[in-house]
């Protein structure tokens, strides 16, 4: 009887442990995957500042290229592709939050004109769905459906991102007109260097906070360093904390100056932004243009026929 109770207790404890482990995994995985878009969403009402700068550049300090490709013109109520390319060297490894090396992730923000929005799933063709893959897109705000964000996702698989976009119809949306509109895009590869609260991540360079001599360097058990700097001016000591990730550049007994780099810069990623233009084309204008071209072609044909008829008349009169 006692053995049966013991077995039951062990079974209950194992079940609880497994349940708690699964919950922790789900919670941490969700928070990590959603962290980067949330930084911008929580801190800024609009991701594009009045100066034209996209706010992601406040945390991703290195400047890198990004490219966007959209059709020159689209008709109303039409689904089209906005292709964002975030190029980088696939062999590069970035410093992760725990100080280890891993692959780069990518993310993007697409700022569309008012009225343009993410295409509903039932409007996306099978060919376009295949290009999109397993990517998930979301609106920057519930009331800003024209601003889309995506990521972070593995860069090796998604350095090219296809956004399925639905164009508006001015017939049903009176604030939309048949005009040329700008589209803005921002794309990053790798982790940022600064968090929204202003603190540094471990994916950046750390500088000395005082001038003096490095009196002690302690390597911490979980990685990183504590660097003690003895100020030569008044003798007081300053301790700089270096998280796991950056490589140390100084040694004990070395003289250093304030703001001198204590570590290398491990960042291999960066952020870039670009823009494109798209025309919301009026179908009646297209039909009118086609009618005009057809009229010109028909007029030229009639002129040629009339000329040949006139030449025949002249030839017959000369023979007569």
From Swiss-Prot:
Residues that coordinate or bind heme: 36, 56, 59-60
Subunit structure: The 4 large subunits of the cytochrome b6-f complex are cytochrome b6, subunit IV (17 kDa polypeptide, petD), cytochrome f and the Rieske protein, while the 4 small subunits are PetG, PetL, PetM and PetN. The complex functions as a dimer.
Alphabetically ordered keywords of this record: Chloroplast, Electron transport, Heme, Iron, Membrane, Metal-binding, Photosynthesis, Plastid, Signal, Thylakoid, Transmembrane, Transmembrane helix, Transport
Free-text cofactor note: Binds 1 heme group covalently.
A Pfam cross-reference name: Apocytochr_F_C
Signal peptide limits: 1-35
Protein family per UniProt: Belongs to the cytochrome f family.
Example of a GO MF term: iron ion binding
UniProt-recorded name of the protein: Cytochrome f
PANTHER family in the cross-refs: CYTOCHROME F, PTHR33288
SUPFAM superfamilies: Cytochrome f subunit of the cytochrome b6f complex, transmembrane anchor (SSF103431), Cytochrome f, large domain (SSF49441), Rudiment single hybrid motif (SSF51246)
Main location: plastid
Function: Component of the cytochrome b6-f complex, which mediates electron transfer between photosystem II (PSII) and photosystem I (PSI), cyclic electron flow around PSI, and state transitions.
Subcellular location: Plastid, Chloroplast thylakoid membrane
Residue ranges of the TM segments: 286-306
A single cellular component GO annotation: chloroplast thylakoid membrane
Membrane association type: Single-pass membrane protein
GO biological process: photosynthesis
Domain of life: Eukaryota
Cofactor: heme
């Amino acid at each position: 009887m006692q053995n049966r109770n013991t077995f039951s207790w062990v079974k209950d404890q194992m079940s609880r442990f497994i349940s708690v482990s699964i919950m922790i995994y789900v919670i941490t995985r969700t928070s990590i995957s959603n962290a980067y878009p949330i930084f911008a969403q929580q801190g800024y009402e609009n991701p594009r500042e009045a100066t034209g700068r996209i706010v992601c550049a406040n945390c991703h300090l290195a400047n890198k290229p990004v490219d966007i490709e959209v059709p020159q013109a689209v008709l109303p109520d039409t689904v089209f592709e906005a292709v964002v390319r975030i190029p980088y060297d696939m062999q590069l490894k970035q410093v992760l939050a725990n100080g280890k090396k891993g692959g780069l992730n990518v993310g993007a923000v697409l700022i569309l004109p008012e009225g343009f929005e993410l295409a509903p799933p039932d409007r996306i063709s099978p060919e376009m769905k295949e290009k999109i893959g397993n990517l998930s897109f979301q609106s920057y705000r519930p009331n800003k459906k024209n601003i889309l964000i995506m990521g972070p996702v593995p860069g090796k698989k998604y350095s090219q991102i296809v956004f399925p976009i639905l164009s508006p119809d001015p017939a049903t949306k009176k604030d939309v007109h048949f005009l040329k509109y700008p589209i803005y895009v921002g794309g990053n590869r790798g982790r940022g260097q600064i968090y929204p609260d202003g603190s540094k991540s471990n994916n950046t360079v750390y500088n000395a906070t005082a001038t003096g001599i490095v009196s002690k360097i302690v390597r911490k058990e979980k990685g990183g360093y504590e660097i003690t700097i003895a100020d030569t001016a008044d003798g007081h000591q300053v301790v700089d904390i270096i998280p796991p990730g950056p490589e140390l550049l100084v040694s004990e007994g070395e003289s250093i100056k304030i703001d001198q780099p204590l570590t290398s810069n491990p960042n291999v990623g960066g952020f870039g932004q670009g823009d494109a233009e798209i025309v919301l084309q009026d179908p009646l204008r297209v039909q009118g243009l086609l009618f005009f071209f057809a009229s010109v072609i028909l007029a030229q044909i009639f002129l040629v026929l009339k000329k040949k008829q006139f030449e025949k008349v002249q030839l017959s009169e000369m023979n007569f």
